[in-house]
Design a protein with these regions (language model features):
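Glycine-rich, proline-tolerant flexible connector loops at the mouths of alpha/beta enzymes
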Residues: 46-64, 104, 172-179
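N-terminal beta-alpha supersecondary unit
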Residues: 2, 17-60
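Short, acidic/polar
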Residues: 28-40, 84-90, 152-162
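Alpha-helix-loop-beta-strand connector modules within alpha/beta enzyme cores
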Residues: 9, 56-80, 111-130
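Catalytic cores of alpha/beta
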Residues: 70-100
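Short, hydrophobic/glycine-enriched beta-strand segments
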Residues: 5-11
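Structural motif
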Residues: 42, 50, 72, 95-96, ...
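Conserved anion-binding
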Residues: 12-14, 18-19, 23-25, 93, ...
Length: 179
């Protein structure tokens, strides 16, 4: 039997942790370094940190914040948001992340998954996928990017399979309908 794991996802916007409902109306709920440290003290198994506006704003990861979070948690730490190049992957890992989550940038440039897996190993490459119900899609779910703001033509199941074939070692599925 598989062991159940508690994985906490922190959505970060403008350097603050936020909480929204169905990817909308995010409100400030705290300072991300303090929240990460508190979850670590509560013995969560893994921490996922999403900069939910980096890709939409066309900027890279916030390395200083990643480094400060990494200094407080000693569990697997995955970071997503604004990671669009191999150098972004490298700098995010050097800042303290053990894994990177590729979402919008992977849709725009699927070879980033392959290159990242080749250089850093597929255990470091996580496909982050925001999906919502859509009867037009073969699986019944459509992929969205840029924090759920932009609809794609990708079927969620087909994209997940392709990402694994490209080298993604894990998938984090964010259900926009159940968020």
């Amino acid at each position: 039997m598989l062991k159940k794991r508690i994985i906490v996802c922190l959505d970060v916007k403008d350097g603050r942790t936020t909480k929204g409902v169905k990817f909308q109306n995010n409100i400030d709920i705290g300072e991300p370094v303090e929240m990460a440290a508190e979850y670590y003290r509560q013995c969560v198994d893994e921490l996922v940190f999403y900069d939910i506006i980096a890709s939409a704003r066309g900027r890279g990861p916030i390395l200083d914040l990643i480094s400060r979070v990494a200094s407080q948690v000693f569990i697997p730490f995955c970071v997503g948001g604004g990671i669009g190049t191999v150098e972004d992957i490298r700098s995010t890992i050097l800042a303290g992340a053990e894994k990177v989550s590729l979402n919008s940038q992977a849709v725009k440039n699927p070879s980033l998954i392959t290159e990242g897996a080749r250089i850093f190993g597929n255990q470091c490459i996580v496909l982050g996928m925001d999906a919502a119900k859509d009867d037009e899609m073969p699986s019944g779910y459509r992929v969205y990017i840029n924090g759920g703001r932009v609809k794609t033509d990708l079927d969620a199941l087909a994209w997940a399979k392709k990402a694994v074939d490209l080298g993604a070692g894990e998938i984090v599925l964010n259900s926009m309908d159940a968020d």
